[in-house]
Amino acid sequence: MLGVEPLLREEATEAAVKQVKSPFILHIATHGLFETTTNPKDPTIDKDSLLRSSLVLAGVKEEKIDGDNGLLTALEATGLNLLGTELVVLSACDTGVGGISPGEGVYGLRRAFAIAGAQSQIISLWKVDDQGTKDLMVKYYQRLLDGNIGRTEALRQTQLEMLRGQAGEKYTHPYFWASFIPSGNWLPIPPRQK
């Protein structure tokens, strides 16, 4: 089902991610950032809300001539070509948070990837543990790629397995599994069209 084309370590640059065209599934495992507002009592939307959520990519500390700084902001993510993309998994900290707009919801990476065309997303609501997240994702994909289970149900079953200690006692605390939530299409991933 998956024709994986990994971008690993120094290959996972902002420019390389921006060139990805309509992948069936896009999985980004990196660091996520969210800059809070200067007034935490007023988390409402501001003109820069889509600039406050970002993913850290390779070369973030290097000076760039082309304008890419190694941070893929939510605003930049809206310009990705994700039409036909069934699922985006943002396996990083704070990928589900953003500026809040009354009547509109959260402006952040989830909204950005939906605007770009992704049918569904798996996002996180707080800082996550690297090893626990890796183990959760491996089990999630094992269930998901079976083909008989929906995207949300695959995540739910994986989280229950961790809660019950079936993935190891160290993962029973919600910190390790409850951060990840689904958004969008909850149905099984359809067979990939050739």
PLM regions and their residue ranges:
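Catalytic cores of enzymes
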Residues: M1-K194
